[in-house]
Amino acid sequence: MGQLTVEAAAGRRGLREFVDHPYRKYRGDPVWVPPLRVSQLDLLDEGKNPLWRHARRTLYLARRDGRVVGRVAYIEDDEHMRVHDERIAFFGFFEADDEQVAGALLDVVEAHARSAGMLAVRGPINGTMN
């Protein structure tokens, strides 16, 4: 197996890679019913999804030899922290079917949360306000 890296998804290309990953991963799987790509893009669009009025996200992609092999979103929701009086972060949009990839993605989320002063991480969530 090649070298595994995890990095923030940058720009429109990174967003597209983040959204497209499960479509490539599960292509040909007869039991996978894919959501509409446009609905997934809208969930992550800071101008369309009202969640992002009071929350921030960082999208991470795991790559092995340059190929996307996993993804996760790190999310901080200011409204949740205010209402519930707790300093927690969330993770969502998690895709990994390899233990090493899963561990690397969750390690990045945990490190991000610690650096932001969060006391815990909760998830997975799907990027809606519910």
Locations of regions flagged by a protein language model:
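Acyl-donor binding region in acyl/amide transferases
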Residues: 82-130
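Conserved beta-strand in the GNAT
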Residues: 61, 67-76
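Alpha-helical subdomain
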Residues: 48, 75-79
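A short helix-loop-beta-strand connector motif used in the catalytic cores of GNAT acetyltransferases and
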Residues: 45-64
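Short amphipathic alpha-helix that is part of the acyltransferase structural core
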Residues: 1-47, 90
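Short beta-strand or tight-loop elements
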Residues: 2, 55-58, 70
